[in-house]
Amino acid sequence: LAKREKLRILLAYELRKQVVTRLVERIHNAERVNDMKQSMIDRLNELGGQGKPFVFCLDYEMSELILLEEPLAQQELLFDIGGVTNSLARSVSDTPAVLRAIPISEEAYAERFAVIRHALERGDSFLANLTVATPIELNISLEEVFLRSQARYKCYLPGRFVCFSPETFVRIVGNEISCFPMKGTIDATLPHAAETILGDYKETAEHYTITDLIRNDLSRVSHHVEVRRFRYIDELVTSRGHLLQVSSEIVGQLAPDWRAHLGSILSELLPAGSISGAPKEATIRAIAEAEGEPRGFYTGICGYFDGETLDSGVMIRFIEQQADGGLRYRSGGGITINSQCAEEYREVCQKVYLPFV
């Protein structure tokens, strides 16, 4: 009995030691991550304060920053942001683009959906953006996708990803900061498409939630925050036809010295509310559990600072290249307590498309 008791005490001690060791490792890892984040913020603040132009991509986890000065002269990252581009004239083939998707199974999606559903039922979240990665095959290069895509925010990093996003993160002109969260799409050819999407209860509830979240986020960095436009419609041209996209515009006023705090402002607003959810911190934890892998640059942000103004986008509509050369198309959608798994699964599958005809 004495030997057993000694063994039990020894095992308990070893277990506690392992737990403490793992806790210390997590603390050290967290400190390293925080140091990296602060370094990125400081660098953005520095360049903004100096009025130096740059282009950047910042990943969802805020663990990797691509930051290039003299953005129009470099060719490491091809970009076209709000019509400003470093993409030199290149010939584009007239080969019809063919994208073949190999979707994850509905059962696999349902497992992720169940994690989010449980968080909603517990009250941890009332809107969460659940995303998936769909393996695809393409008959054209990612550079060709970049060149042929029609989108306000386009980035191509060879060997890593191409992004062709319609969604603005923030624009800053003068001292005014603006956000344009997107929530809700519908096939533009459907009868009464605009009336249908604007009258949809679930879409309306999601839009109210995300607009309120963004308004609160902007209030952390600016004053006189207001919703200037609520649920207006844009039309998108895609390889699957025309879509109607619902957005809102929220604006605030920054302090005159905002350029010297540009990195800090962006950090306060990240991750974007439209691709995370509300309340943000608890929802991010639920998303991480459900998705089971880092998002990387997908749903991060890209932007161009010309020394005076900033234009940045949320990196949705995104194809990533894996180490073995395989391609994955990332897509997602907002989940609420009223969401149906089968409908959400269809939506993420339908979002796998190219933004050109």
Question: Each predicted region: which residue ranges?
Answer:
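Polybasic, lysine-rich low-complexity intrinsically disordered segments
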Residues: 3-6
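Extended alpha-helical targeting/anchoring segments
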Residues: 11-357
